[in-house]
Swiss-Prot record:
The keyword Transmembrane helix applies. NCBIfam families: sulP. It comes from Arabidopsis thaliana (Mouse-ear cress). It is found in: Membrane. Belongs to the SLC26A/SulP transporter (TC 2.A.53) family. The keyword Nucleus does not apply. Residues 1-92, 137-140, 189-194, 269-279, 353-370, 429-433, 493-653 are cytoplasmic. Residues 520-643 form the STAS domain. This is Probable sulfate transporter 3.4. It is a multi-pass membrane protein. Residues 114-115, 162-167, 216-247, 301-331, 392-407, 455-471 are extracellular. H(+)/sulfate cotransporter that may play a role in the regulation of sulfate assimilation. One of its GO terms (molecular function) is symporter activity. The gene is SULTR3;4.
Length: 653
């Protein structure tokens, strides 16, 4: 039937050879409404960059309401601030103080992981949370330094600049990297390009995070064993070589203290995981361990000097660091590269954590707003002696379990850090480095997700392979290259899906007009004279030749099967195009060429249910006209019914 007709035919049921007549209505396949090129471009841009239609809430509103909605959109704190009360404040104060007890020791620990002065970790737990509380859309995200971004920054910068021999330059590069991370993150949000981070697939992140966790854990052997001279490399082989080559530096006092507190921290973590109501045990244990270990070192300082400690930490607010940003020189490219990579990782972690807890409380986290909030807080942080920060899963989990209601919990946490910076810094003088190593170890062990990796193995072997590439790349090559390898494998997977799309043969489920894959439904049966194929992807220049060759191969194989079984001659190939969401000029040419080659073999090509834009392009390219009256149908059932009826009327077998 043509796309402009609509008629009813009588036909013999395709499921049997009886003469039973059934009435099947043959529907027309309509062209989409005509649109100008500008209308099409506008819709396409809207679908790509504005899938959430952010301007919808402003329609049919007064100017006053639009201004209010605009402020709420830019500053989410205005959305819930007017309804804030003492009951909410009580919950936020409790949760804020709880996460502060975790953020203070973690901030010091993660700064050392990034090869930065410990005080920078505390600075980074003060300014960024305040900015996020105003700009962020998550109620439960607890902001501060995180292990993965700290590790990546430390490993990338230390490859070119020594954090000990050239500490000032290293610090400048750290702040500059943070600035570029923020610029990159905010730009993604402003330009609504957040889909770019989707190239970091779940499998990639599982493998990368696990590999980074192993590297971080091995790096902590320096602190746990009391080693003074240690490699600056991050790969597993040089790290383990350094551990055993410096056995003479191992300190039994440090080892005993480290194992003791590590056991306590792991035990409290296990208790809180088994009984979430006891979350406060694992939340308070790092700070309690810092206090107890500091007292122990202070009391035994005159008897042993084997246990190293932090030493002097300056009191006071974050000093300005705008003058330390490094915008010219030999290391600028390194700062930009480090900023982009740490920016991607921290952004991915922050958004994932925010959405996780938002789903538990049934509210929405706006991805683009989060990108801008995280980006702006890192840009501001780089000017106030902070390094890359984002939402931490461990702190956010504690924040959620502690009953946080709004982002005010971040303000409370920052206030607690402020008090620490102003008055309590001398108390950390004797804090042993081994306790910082134990805290980091406890935090990163949970990043190795065995169950997620096993699920990848069960569900998708290629995803599991991607996960392994990321994991071993981080372990044996380097952290950034390991990530790059995993992203490359993910891109190859995408290319394979695009260039080698799936096609399947359909058959009829007896007693119905339903056609489904012969490979999935055993009861489905072939229709004599027809080869029914479904294409399950767009048809582009990258796969058009492959699809053409694959369909011709299907036809050859079907004809060979018919000859072997003395079956009914193959007359028609039906292509179900329901899943073909788009087609380009190469795809159109491939369809036209396929029709021509099939005609030479006395085979008819029929298209079924091409969707809007595909239908429009088929019409404009004259392919529908070339297919003729019986070359286009709405459903496979209608195509089989109409063609079978026509053959029967013409006396064809």
């Amino acid at each position: 039937m043509g796309h402009g007709t609509n008629r009813v035919e009588d036909m013999a049921s395709p499921n049997n050879g009886t003469a039973g007549e059934t009435v099947v209505e043959i529907h027309s396949v309509c062209l989409p409404p005509k649109k100008t090129a500008f209308q099409k471009l506008k819709k396409r841009v809207g679908d790509v960059f504005f899938p959430d239609d952010p301007l919808q809430r402003f329609r049919n509103q007064t100017w006053r309401n639009r201004v209010i909605l605009g402020l709420q959109s830019l500053f989410p704190i205005f959305t819930w601030g007017s309804q804030y009360d003492l009951k909410l404040l009580r919950s936020d104060v409790i949760s804020g103080l709880t996460i502060a007890s975790l953020a203070i020791p973690q901030g010091i620990s993660y700064a050392k992981l990034a090869n930065l002065p410990p005080i920078v970790g505390l600075y980074s737990s003060f300014v960024p949370p305040l900015i996020y509380a105003v700009l962020g859309s998550s109620r439960h995200l607890a902001v501060g330094p995180v292990s993965i971004a700290s590790l990546v920054m430390g490993s990338m910068l230390s490859e070119s600049v020594s954090p000990t021999q050239d500490s000032i330059l290293y610090l400048k590069l750290a702040f500059t990297s943070t600035f570029f991370a923020g610029v990159f993150q905010a730009s993604l949000g402003l330009l609504r390009l957040g889909f770019m981070i989707d190239f970091l697939s779940k499998a990639t992140l599982i493998g990368f995070t696990a590999g980074a966790a192993v590297i971080v854990s091995l790096q902590q052997l320096k602190g746990l064993l009391g080693i003074v001279h240690f490699t600056g490399k991050m790969q597993i082989v040089p790290v383990m070589s350094s551990v055993f080559n410096h056995r003479s530096e191992w300190s039994w006092e440090t080892i005993v203290m480290g194992i003791g507190f590590l056991s306590i921290l792991l035990t409290t973590r296990h208790i809180s995981m088994r009984k979430p109501k006891l979350f406060w045990i694992s939340a308070a244990s790092p700070l309690a361990s810092v206090i107890i270990s500091t007292l122990l070192v202070y009391l035994i300082r005159s008897k042993t000097h084997a246990i190293s400690f932090i030493g002097h930490l300056p009191k006071g607010l974050n000093p300005p660091s705008l003058n330390m940003l490094y915008f010219s020189g030999a290391h600028l490219a390194l700062a930009i590269k480090t900023g982009i990579i740490t920016g991607i990782l921290s952004l991915t972690e922050g958004i994932a954590v925010g959405r996780t807890f938002a789903s538990l409380k049934n509210y929405q986290v706006n991805g683009n707003k989060e990108m801008m909030a995280i980006g702006f807080m890192n840009m501001a942080g780089s000017c106030t002696s902070c390094y890359v920060t984002t939402g931490s899963f461990s702190r956010s989990a504690v924040n959620y379990n502690a009953g946080a209601k709004t982002a005010v919990s971040n303000i409370v946490m920052a206030s607690a850090v402020l008090v620490t910076l102003l008055f309590l810094m001398p108390l950390f003088y004797y804090t042993p480095n081994v306790i910082l190593a134990a805290i980091i170890l406890t935090a990163v062990i949970g990043l190795i997700d065995y169950q997620a990796a096993y699920k990848l193995w069960k569900v998708d072997k290629f995803d599991f392979f991607t996960c392994l590439c990321s994991f071993f790349g981080v372990l044996f090559v380097s952290v950034p290259l390991g990530l790059a390898i995993a992203v490359a494998v993910s891109v190859i997977k995408i290319l394979l899906h695009v260039t080698r799309p799936n096609t399947s043969e359909f058959g009829n489920i007896p007693g119905t007009q339903i056609y489904q894959s012969l490979g999935r439904y055993r009861e489905a049966s072939r229709i004599p004279g027809f080869l029914i194929l479904a294409i399950e992807s767009p048809i582009y220049f990258a796969n058009s030749t492959y699809l053409q060759d694959r369909i011709l191969r299907w036809a050859r194989e079907e004809e060979n099967r018919i000859k072997e079984n003395n079956g009914t001659t193959l007359k028609c190939i039906i292509l179900d195009m329901t899943a073909v969401s788009a087609i380009d000029t190469s795809g159109l040419e491939a369809v036209f060429e396929l029709r021509r080659r099939l005609e030479k073999q006395s085979l008819q090509l029929v298209l079924v249910n091409p969707v809007g834009t595909v239908m429009e392009k088929l019409h404009k390219s004259k392919i529908i006209e070339a297919l003729g009256l019986s070359g286009l149908y709405l459903t496979v059932g209608e195509a089989v019914a109409d063609l079978s009826s026509t053959w029967k009327a013409n006396g064809q077998p």
